[in-house]
Each structure stands twice: as structure tokens, then as C-alpha cells.
Amino acid sequence: MFTRLITTSALTGAIALTIGSQAFAQTELAWWHGMTGANNEMVNELSKEFNESQSEYKIVPVYKGNYPETLNAGIAAFRSKQPPAILQVFDAGSGVMMAAEGAIVPAAEVLEKGGYKFDKSQYLPGIVAYYSKPDGTMLSFPYNSSSPILYYNKDAFKKAGLDENKPPKTWPEVFEAAKKIKASGASPCGFTSTWLTWIQTENFAAWNNVPYGTNENGLAGTDVKLEINSPLYVEHFQAIADLAKDGTFRYGGRTSEAKQLFTSGECAMLTESSGGLGDVVKSGINYGIGQLPYYEGHGPQNTIPGGASLWVFAGLSDDQYKGIAEFFNFLSQSKIQVKLHEKSGYLPVTLAAYEETKKSDFYEKNPGRETPILQMMGKEPTENSKGVRLVNLPQVRDILNEEFEAMLGGKQDAKTALDNAVKRGNAAIAAAQ
């Protein structure tokens, strides 16, 4: 939570501003984002609520495409000296933004410009640490943090003779359930997944406590060598490739496209961000939630944050920075965090909002909704599960996706795909140093 710092001069200025408020034009703050569907509706709702809560600043949300497209649009806008006030950057883009010293103003500094002091002890530690420098300085505001979970179609489970109240816990159990669902005709497809990079490699590493790369996956140093071709990865992706041969596993796309395969009833199981919940609920499907599957003897350890955070560029006016600070403070309020969490499935970033949600019996009334939080906070992180930080993670993800697509298309096996991904990824990381 943020504590307001009030000085005599600030109070005098506030009184003067109130008296002469009509003489000042409203400061508009463009918020570029990559949210669609129910999450886009939430962006618009929160912007409207903030705008109606005061008259000095106006948040103007602008959809700029999917997460990678939004990041690229923001970088291009900064280079042309026309950046938005606020840019939503997905987790993979954090390393890119952190490396752009001089191009961004840390969120903690923005808050200070607005008269607020950031108290990181009031936030979920894993989330704040992910978006902070080693010295603890918060670089971006964690707007929509998420954790990957398993969604499953209860009706399809019942038709296939599976227990609709007992989601599979391990990957072998998921694969067996997928085969039964496909063979029984309960659904045309047993299993799909969004974000093969974030969920099936980065979180796979953390949740199963195996290294993604050297140097603590990049958190202990930028000279990283990928290790995603070790035996457990090969076993996992070969199982997925085998299921893809007859359509038991169906590939939807590189980001969140596969969610449509689940909400349409095409596929009976989906690994997806907890932030995808809004669209799942909106679809009306009879769904259940389970924890992210793991391999016995390896997991479960802890998941790492996904979603996105809000970054602020350098070169804005003092009025803009003050307005952004007010907006960040607004977003940190418990009532706002509770609303965002309950409606969207994203995690409440403050401990106060989490406690308030628990006290309301929300989790008892909505089984599975606490799962993504417990996954992230359940165990102390290891060297393998603190996160992944590469200066060019979006580029490395593209390389992995190309190899996965060739594998799923039957052009190569999992070991070849992962060996190629490591070789190409390491070359790209070295070139970006």
C-alpha cells in the first residue's frame, strides 16, 4: 500500500488547486494495453471508475494488440518521442524494459513524485520481487499478475467416466484422462494449452524444480545457457507430441488462442493463466479448476508470475507523473484489487486484498479460485523457481515456438526440437549481451 506524504507546501498547493481547479485543463494519460475479452472490459471499467473519482486526470485506455505487439508499439513510440503515459508489458518483456536504463522511470520513483511512499511489505512478495531490481526498487506496477492453472470441462469428464470433482494432479494423469476423453467421444480433443513457452517451459521449470537455464535462469547474471533439453523436458514434450498425432492434444497458437478451444467445448482440458477465468466464466461452460500438473519426484514447488505490469517512460511532464501516481494508488486500493481478483482471476497483489477476499468466504463459495495464489506462495523459491529473466526473452520465446510448431507438425521429435531451441536460443542470448 502507498502512504501519502503531506507537507505544508503540498497542502497549500492542494488548496490553491482546489480553489482554481476550473482554470486547469484535465491531464490525459494514455494507457496502452494488450487485454481482450472480459479483461479488456475490466480495463475500461477501472479506467472509468478512476476518472469519475477525481477531475484532474483522465485515463484513456488504448488496445495495441496482443502482449508482444503492445511491447513493440511502446518501444517504437518511445523512439519516436511519443510514448504513452503508461505501457502494459507482459512478464517476458520485463527483462527488455529493465535493460532500457534511462528510458523508463521506476514505479517507486513515480509514486514519490506524486507524494506516495511504496511499502513493499504490503504486497505479495513473489510478485513484487519479480518486478524489482536486486536492491528492491520496484520498477513497474504489478497490475495483472497471474499463475497458470488447469481448467477442465466437468460435463466431458462425466461423459468419459472420469470423476468430475477430481482433476488430474500429475502430467501422466492428464495425458491418460485426455486419451479417455478422446476415445469416449466426450470431446473431440482431450487437452490443449495456451502459452507453451510460459506455461510448459518457464513455469514447468519452476513447478517441477528443474533449471530453465544457468545463472538461476538469468536472475543471478545475464550470461545464460538454456537447459530446457534435459531429460524431463524431453519426456514431457514427446508425450505432448505423441498426443498431437491423433488430435488428443490440439495446438491453438503461441499466446492465449487455445482458450477458445476450451470455451467452445472442443477440448476438455486447458492449462491457461488464472487471468483467463473471465472468458471461461463468460462462456457458460461447466468448468472446474485444478492446480498446474507436475511430475512425481520433481514437483510441486512454486509457480512464477505471469500476466503483466505497468511501466512508465522517461520524458513525461510533472503533471503526468503525478496523475500516474494517483492512478497506481487507486489500483492498489483493497476494494479495487478484490474486484480485479474476483472478476478476472488475476491475483490480488496486496496482502490486504487477499485477506479481505478470504474473510468474505469467497474461496469457500468458489472452489479452486485460491489455487493460483497457493501455488505461488506455497513454498520458498529455489534457484530454479524464482523466475526467468533474459534481456531478450520475447525473442527466445519466438525461437521455442518455432521449434514446438515444427514438432507438433510432425517434422521433428521433442529431443530435436529442444536441442535446436537451446542452440538457437543460446546464440540469440549471446548476441543480445
Swiss-Prot record:
One GO cellular component term noted in the UniProt record for this chain: periplasmic space
Matching Gene3D superfamilies: Periplasmic binding protein-like II
Residues binding sn-glycerol 3-phosphate: 67, 91, 146, 273, 307, 346, 397
Keyword annotations from UniProtKB, A to Z: Periplasm, Signal, Transport
Chief localization: periplasm
Pfam families noted in UniProt: SBP_bac_8
Keyword check for Repeat: no
Signal peptide segment: 1-25
Subunit note: The complex is composed of two ATP-binding proteins (UgpC), two transmembrane proteins (UgpA and UgpE) and a solute-binding protein (UgpB).
Family stated for the protein in its record: Belongs to the bacterial solute-binding protein 1 family.
Protein name per the record: sn-glycerol-3-phosphate-binding periplasmic protein UgpB
Native species: Brucella melitensis biotype 1 (strain ATCC 23456 / CCUG 17765 / NCTC 10094 / 16M)
Native organism taxonomy: Bacteria, Pseudomonadati, Pseudomonadota, Alphaproteobacteria, Hyphomicrobiales
